[in-house]
């Protein structure tokens, strides 16, 4: 999935991108841990929020796959998130085989 394919109120599956910016994780009043940033790919940029176990897991410049998440409109912008039960992992692009 690419950023230009995102639609509000839809699931996000296997979105691959690079973390352009990433704020420090913080705790919101409900006690949940959240970390915000900007994810980019060759088609654009989107705000991203990592929640709970996914917050604090990555650093700026990491390539990630948002394997299970959601997309919504937040402050008039598209935003993707792991939500409470989503999953994001670090992505290592396949390297060409040496001959």
Can you describe what each PLM-predicted range is?
Residues 7-8, 18-20, 24:
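N-terminal leader/targeting segments and the first structural element of proteins
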Residues 15, 44-48, 78:
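Short beta-strand segments
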Residues 23-31, 53-99:
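OB-fold single-stranded nucleic acid-binding module
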Residues 10-12, 32-34, 63:
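A general secondary-structure signal for short beta-strands and their flanking turns/coil
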Residues 22-48:
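OB-fold (S1/OB) nucleic-acid-binding surfaces
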Residues 13-15, 19, 64-65:
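Hydrophobic core residues within well-ordered beta-strands of beta-rich domains
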Residues 1-11:
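Short boundary/loop segments of OB/S1/cold-shock single-stranded nucleic-acid-binding domains
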């Amino acid at each position: 999935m690419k950023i230009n394919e995102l639609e509000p109120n839809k699931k996000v599956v296997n979105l691959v991108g690079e973390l352009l910016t990433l704020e420090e994780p913080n705790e919101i009043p409900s006690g949940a841990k959240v970390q915000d940033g900007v994810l980019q790919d060759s088609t654009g940029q989107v705000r991203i929020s990592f929640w709970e176990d996914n917050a604090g897991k990555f650093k700026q410049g990491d390539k990630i796959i948002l394997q299970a998440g959601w997309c919504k409109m937040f402050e008039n912008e598209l935003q993707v998130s792991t939500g409470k039960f989503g999953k994001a992992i670090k992505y290592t692009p396949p390297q060409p085989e040496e001959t």
